[in-house]
Design a protein with these regions (language model features):
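Structured helix-beta-strand junction loops
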Residues: 15-16, 41, 69, 104-106
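Rossmann-like NAD(P)H-binding beta-loop-alpha module
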Residues: 41-71
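Conserved N-proximal alpha/beta basic substrate-recognition cap immediately N-terminal to
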Residues: 1-52
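Short acidic/polar capping segments at secondary-structure boundaries
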Residues: 24-26, 52-56, 76-80, 90-92, ...
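Loop-centered beta-sheet repeat module
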Residues: 63, 68-89
């Protein structure tokens, strides 16, 4: 919510303190457009449409274009599921006004909803210095899709598989 302040702080302090990750990689990773870069570099991502701020498009048009049954809309710069909504081809009209308000203020993602989030949760692999250190599994509370603890989600230690670790290492290799 205080993105501009954070960017200013980073610019002012990047030569005064040492960040664990470089200023450039932090700045790149703040905006979820980094997913587009990873995809261009051969990393599989959730099917996503990237929508620039001010784009004139409706949710109906997006569902028609993608033929998805369910989707998630969210700002490209967001944390803790701020302005993140799970919508379907049957209820999208309920979200049209909020979508139009947000798209007029900031860039957004329209992503295919991955149902396994509800049953399996979301896995986060932590990489430090390009090396895997540990992983967590985030699960949504019953009746919600958001895995963040701000919304009742639960975080627990997770033992990543070798293929998951390899995927994370491949992602790190594809970062700028």
């Amino acid at each position: 919510e205080r993105f501009d302040e954070f960017l200013l702080w980073m610019k002012e302090t990047k030569h005064k303190i040492k960040f664990i990750n470089s200023y450039e990689i932090i700045n790149w990773n703040i905006d979820k457009y980094y997913l587009k870069d990873l995809s261009k570099n051969g990393i599989n991502i959730v099917p996503t449409l990237f929508l620039k701020k001010g784009k004139k498009v409706s949710l109906k048009q997006l569902f028609t274009k993608t033929k998805w049954k369910e989707a998630v809309i969210k700002p490209t710069i967001s944390g803790a599921a701020r302005n993140t909504y799970h919508i379907t081809e049957n209820n999208f009209s309920d979200f049209e006004d909020i979508f139009q308000q947000i798209i007029n203020e900031e860039s957004m993602l329209f992503q295919q909803f991955m149902k396994n989030i509800l049953t399996q949760g979301e896995i986060s692999l932590i990489m430090i210095g390009g090396k895997y250190t540990h992983a967590v599994k985030k699960t949504a509370k019953k009746g919600d899709f958001r895995v963040q603890d701000d919304h009742g989600g639960k975080v627990e230690i997770y033992n990543a598989t070798q293929s998951e670790i390899k995927f994370a290492e491949d992602c790190i290799e594809k970062c700028p």
